[in-house]
């Protein structure tokens, strides 16, 4: 593989420390040696689920499963569990949910929902749903989901007809459903579980979660919160949900460095008009050196994922997949499952897979252009080097994005160079770009501008070279023949929208794509208020 390293430009400094959480009970990460380590040894786990776990190939518990099943599962305690993704926490909280659903066998014949699990993204919710469906086969438990991008009416009908004892949902969609009093009446929640709580907070769902909690839980509801990190904004929500009476279980190994400190990381600097050729050269070299490569490629926008993935897959010899929030739920499920099962492949994606999604054996993560912030960078590279496996991370960085390196100078990052494409390969790539529709190229370019105002802004330092930046961007997408595009990009970069009366290529372009949006939380009726209104 012809990727040369020019020596470490950054080195690890110190250790990432979680902020202390005021008012929380002392961390306790000590494993009790007398705790069972096999599912078959857990006395409080029913034979039904022991058989289901055995059929699914689960025998030995991971540390987080061991802690939850021995310390939380037998009791009715509320708990906060700090654990990284990829440690088996999904199975741990599903078994708790199953137990709460099965408190009384006759309840399976009722039309009530007895357990609610909230997930930050559709992809993660579907992943939890698939795992739950496999484990509940033959148990009588009915599992359903409520997520955006799906038919709301179909979900409502499934809930009202009693097709769910366990509901897995995203906050926005569940808020929509809870505006319907009949849906609220279907809830008799014995357990309320938050997965990836820190990401739920990052996505602006704090108030929504508190509203949902007030609407669907009672004082008898068991509450579990799972989170990889514990920043103050997360602990504040936990207090609102759990109060002060809960168990805190820390499953982080204090001796294990975080993924972003131990995974080898490389930065490849490139000119704007050479981003695609540099990306293709890197991917070709990675896959040729390891035919079993499983790579996730992150891009900043939906349109960029569609365009870059669509062009580059013609030049790569292993299966390629595209995943983002613009696809239907059925498409996303199919793509996720296909990539998870393939022996080798490349997944082009937005940040919908940066956290929570568990794809096994990812050999490399590649970021094409810099992320929005340090947290995004860290979460992206966290997709590789999981479960004791090795991995690598590559960052293809624009010259104008060099200041970003200052924010990750504490990480083990090295500078690398790659062999340029041959003249013939470069000509073929350029031809494929030109064969793409002007609409897809122009829309990808515009969303790239929207995602990187710091690169394309018309600040005083850049005005002298600003035109060169826009020319490079147009050259990248082979769009020199779009009338007025240069003028529009210059106006956009200065925060002025489009020139008055400008019609450009006279194509109608959709507004800038975004992989997620934040909804304004709505006030939901609490269970008590709803019951009073019914009277």
UniProtKB/Swiss-Prot annotation:
Location of the Helicase C-terminal domain: 262-429
Keyword field: ATP-binding, Helicase, Hydrolase, Mitochondrion, mRNA processing, mRNA splicing, Nucleotide-binding, RNA-binding, Transit peptide, Translation regulation
GO molecular function terms noted in the UniProt entry: ATP binding; ATP hydrolysis activity; RNA binding; RNA helicase activity
Motif (DEAD box): 195-198
Span of the transit peptide along the chain: 1-27
Cellular component aspect of the GO annotation: mitochondrial matrix; mitochondrion
Enzyme class: hydrolase
EC number, UniProt record: 3.6.4.13
Alphabetized SMART domains for the sequence: DEXDc, HELICc
Protein location: Mitochondrion matrix
Biased composition (Low complexity): 510-527
Matches recorded under Pfam families: DEAD, Helicase_C
Notes concerning its domains: The Q motif is unique to and characteristic of the DEAD box family of RNA helicases and controls ATP binding and hydrolysis.
Protein name, as recorded: ATP-dependent RNA helicase mss116, mitochondrial
UniProt organism field: Schizosaccharomyces pombe (strain 972 / ATCC 24843) (Fission yeast)
């Amino acid at each position: 593989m012809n990727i040369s390293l020019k020596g470490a430009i950054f080195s690890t400094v110190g250790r990432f420390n979680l902020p202390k959480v005021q008012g929380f009970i002392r961390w306790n990460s000590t494993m009790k040696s007398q705790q069972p380590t096999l599912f078959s040894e857990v006395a409080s786990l029913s034979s039904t689920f022991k058989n289901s776990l055995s059929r699914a190939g689960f025998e030995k518990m991971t540390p987080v499963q061991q802690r939850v099943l021995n310390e939380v599962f037998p009791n009715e305690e509320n708990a906060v569990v700090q654990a990284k993704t990829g440690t088996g926490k999904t199975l741990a909280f599903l078994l708790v949910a199953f137990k709460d659903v099965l408190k009384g066998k006759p309840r399976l014949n009722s039309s009530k929902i007895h357990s609610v699990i909230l997930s930050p993204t559709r992809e993660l919710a579907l992943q939890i749903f698939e795992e739950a469906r496999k484990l509940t086969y033959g148990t009588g438990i009915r599992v359903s989901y409520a997520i955006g991008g799906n038919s709301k009416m179909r979900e409502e009908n499934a809930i009202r007809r009693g097709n769910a004892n366990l509901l897995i949902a995203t906050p926005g969609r569940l808020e929509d459903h809870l505006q319907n009093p009949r849906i609220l009446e279907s809830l008799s929640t014995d357990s309320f579980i938050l997965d990836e709580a820190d990401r739920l907070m990052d996505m602006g769902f704090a108030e929504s979660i508190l509203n949902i909690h007030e609407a669907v839980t009672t004082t008898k509801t068991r509450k579990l919160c799972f989170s990889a990190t514990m920043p103050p904004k997360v602990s504040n929500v936990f207090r609102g949900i759990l109060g002060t009476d809960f168990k805190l279980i820390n499953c982080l190994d204090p001796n294990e460095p975080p993924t972003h400190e131990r995974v080898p990381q490389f930065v490849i600097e490139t000119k704007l008009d050479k981003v695609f050729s540099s990306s293709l050269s890197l991917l070709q070299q990675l896959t040729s050196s390891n035919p079993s490569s499983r790579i996730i490629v992150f891009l900043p926008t939906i349109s960029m994922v569609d365009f870059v993935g669509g062009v580059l897959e013609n030049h790569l010899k292993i299966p390629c997949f595209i995943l983002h929030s613009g696809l239907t739920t059925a498409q996303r499920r199919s793509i996720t499952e296909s990539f998870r099962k393939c022996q080798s492949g490349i997944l082009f994606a937005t940040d919908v897979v940066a956290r929570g999604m568990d794809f096994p054996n990812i050999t490399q993560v590649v970021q094409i252009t810099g992320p929005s912030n340090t947290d995004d960078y860290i979460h992206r590279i966290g997709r590789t080097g999981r479960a004791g496996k090795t991995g690598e991370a590559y960052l293809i960085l624009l010259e104008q994005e060099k200041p970003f390196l200052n924010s990750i100078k504490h990480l083990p990052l090295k500078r690398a160079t790659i062999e340029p494409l041959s003249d013939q390969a470069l000509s073929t790539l350029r031809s494929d770009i030109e064969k793409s529709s002007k609409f897809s190229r122009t829309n990808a370019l515009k969303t790239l501008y929207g995602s990187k105002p710091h690169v394309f802004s018309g600040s005083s330092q850049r005005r002298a070279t600003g035109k060169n930046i826009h020319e490079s961007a147009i050259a990248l997408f082979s769009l020199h023949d779009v009338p007025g595009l240069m003028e529009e990009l210059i106006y956009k970069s200065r925060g002025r929208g489009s020139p008055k009366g400008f019609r450009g290529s006279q194509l109608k372009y959709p507004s800038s794509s975004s992989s997620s949006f934040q909804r304004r939380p709505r006030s939901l009726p609490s269970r008590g208020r709803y019951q009073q209104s019914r009277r």
